[in-house]
């Protein structure tokens, strides 16, 4: 799937968008072993729920334990981040409840990454740091100084970055790879855009470029951009009609408060079940056509600051707020950005690409390349994958075998039946490590093993050419918009599937119910 736009382009953008955060995601909290309760005659043989809670276990996720210490430390980080964003911090119990939900999902994702054999080594972290520093026009040393000045240790930042890269690779494999946009869908989308000239600007993007750390400038023209935040009241799979009705009532109560004027970000932080709850519900900015149809119908005609009605999806009840919108010259601005040393903002779902219309033909240097991909897994380590490719490279350079034959025999990419042939590759079509290695090759030269988020590659450049890609860029942009439209619900479905298949014993929740019953 090396030429799969939705996986390659999105992975590239996500890794580069890992910014110099002043705070850390909740995964930065270090797990601490639970302390056993001291033995004594005054203790019952089987502790009551409240005593189990005091013992130090906040939740059990499959076979993993989340401790109270983890929850407390992560809550401190979340509280600091909310304050920096200007969002009211929920009361301690509510904050810990939200934080624990986040930790549970992070633990489930981590377990899934372990199962799939996804690992991130020090070299990959260094590579990401160099890219982030380059994008922000600073040296890695200056970047480290800024990070430490914010009160975060360099070791904490590296761990956070490693976790982010690993989770991004997991989501790419588990979610993005399953979103397939057909040529027929692209054709239909472009025809629809022709009937709506204002929206059609969204697909007239400039030629793909290497990512550059350019500050956003006010655009003179562009498509409608929409910045959304949400409050999600999740409806678990298998909920009874009474449970669904109770959750709807809860969502309606939150909607009434939002319509009345209560701060939306604070409501989201305290009540939303969405993965972006502790960012005030902020989902980021995209062209209008990049949002799911349900969201566009509910919020597409609203003005900035307005709140939608209740939106029901397969995951539950959504309340949407239009944080900002722009088009025809006004750039969309993120609401309440967290202070950070770098000019970028974190987002689970990245903003769409540049939308300025090109003037005249769009000419780029295309590379005709082929590759052999060896993926890492529980039975194929990084060292083993690299060594296998080194052995193949030696045989290729000795002239004993042909590249296409080795690709058919060994490559684990979908291009293997075609001898690893990627066709003509535009700038930006592949992830940065792959593209950098490919650009350094002369025609007919074979690279050493190259590490990317997909695994290890051997790359051979066959030829290069200058080519007008105006039509291709428009189709690529349309495909990306269609992908982004599906990404949000697909990600939420995947999270719900992870949760529904897991054993989760939430002791915080049990403790709260016990106290309510005793009142």
Curated annotation (Swiss-Prot):
Broad class of the protein's primary localization: periplasm
Compartments (UniProt record): Periplasm
Gene that encodes it: surA
Protein name: Chaperone SurA
Signal peptide residue numbers: 1-31
PpiC domain segment(s): 223-324, 364-463
Any matching Pfam family: SurA_N
Domain notes: The PPIase activity resides only in the second parvulin domain. The N-terminal region and the C-terminal tail are necessary and sufficient for the chaperone activity of SurA. The PPIase activity is dispensable for SurA to function as a chaperone. The N-terminal region and the C-terminal tail are also required for porin recognition.
């Amino acid at each position: 799937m090396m030429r799969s736009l939705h996986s390659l382009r999105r992975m590239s953008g996500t890794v580069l968008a890992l910014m110099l955060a002043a705070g850390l995601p909740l995964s930065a909290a270090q797990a601490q072993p639970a302390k056993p309760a001291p033995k004594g005659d005054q203790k019952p043989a089987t502790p009551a729920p409240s005593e189990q809670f005091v013992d130090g276990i906040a939740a059990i996720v499959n076979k993993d334990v989340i401790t109270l210490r983890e929850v407390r430390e992560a809550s401190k980080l979340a509280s600091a981040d909310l304050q920096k964003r200007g969002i009211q911090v929920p009361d301690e119990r509510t904050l810990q409840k939200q934080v624990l939900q986040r930790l549970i999902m992070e633990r489930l994702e981590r377990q899934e990454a372990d199962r799939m054999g996804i690992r991130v080594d020090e070299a990959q972290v260094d590579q990401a740091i160099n890219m982030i520093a380059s994008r922000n026009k600073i040296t890695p040393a200056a970047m480290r100084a800024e990070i430490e000045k914010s009160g975060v240790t360099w070791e904490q930042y590296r761990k956070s970055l490693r976790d982010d890269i690993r989770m991004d690779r997991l989501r790419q494999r588990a979610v993005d790879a399953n979103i397939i946009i057909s040529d027929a869908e692209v054709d239909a989308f472009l025809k629809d855009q022709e009937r709506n000239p204002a929206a059609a600007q969204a697909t007239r993007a400039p030629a793909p470029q290497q990512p550059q750390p350019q500050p956003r400038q006010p655009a003179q023209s562009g498509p409608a951009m929409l910045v959304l935040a949400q409050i999600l009241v999740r409806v678990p799979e298998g909920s009874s009609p009474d449970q669904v009705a109770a959750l709807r009532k809860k969502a309606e109560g939150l909607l009434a408060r939002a319509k009345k004027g209560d701060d939306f970000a604070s409501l989201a932080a305290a009540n939303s079940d969405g993965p972006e709850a502790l960012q005030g519900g902020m989902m980021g900015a995209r062209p209008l056509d990049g949002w799911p149809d349900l969201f566009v119908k509910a919020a597409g005609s609203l003005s900035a600051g307005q709140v939608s009605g209740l939106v029901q999806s397969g995951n539950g009840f959504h309340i949407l707020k239009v944080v900002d919108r722009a088009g025809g010259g006004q750039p969309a601005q993120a609401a309440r950005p967290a202070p950070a040393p770098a000019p970028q903002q974190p987002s689970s779902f990245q903003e769409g690409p540049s939308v300025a219309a090109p003037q005249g033909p769009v000419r780029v240097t295309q590379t005709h390349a082929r590759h052999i991909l060896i993926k890492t897994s529980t039975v194929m380590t990084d060292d083993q994958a690299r060594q296998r490719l080194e052995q193949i490279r030696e045989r290729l350079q000795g002239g004993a075998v042909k590249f296409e034959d080795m690709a058919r025999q060994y490559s684990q990419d979908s291009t293997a039946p075609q001898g690893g042939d990627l066709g003509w590759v535009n700038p930006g079509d592949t992830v940065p490590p792959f593209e950098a290695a490919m650009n350094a090759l002369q025609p007919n030269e074979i690279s050493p093993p190259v590490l990317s988020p997909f695994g290890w590659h051997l790359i051979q450049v066959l030829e290069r050419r200058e080519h007008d890609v105006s039509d291709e860029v428009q189709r690529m942009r349309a495909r990306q918009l269609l992908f982004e439209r599906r990404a949000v619900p697909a990600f939420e479905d995947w999270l719900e599937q992870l949760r529904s298949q897991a054993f989760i014993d939430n002791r915080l929740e049990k403790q709260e119910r016990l106290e309510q019953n005793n009142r």
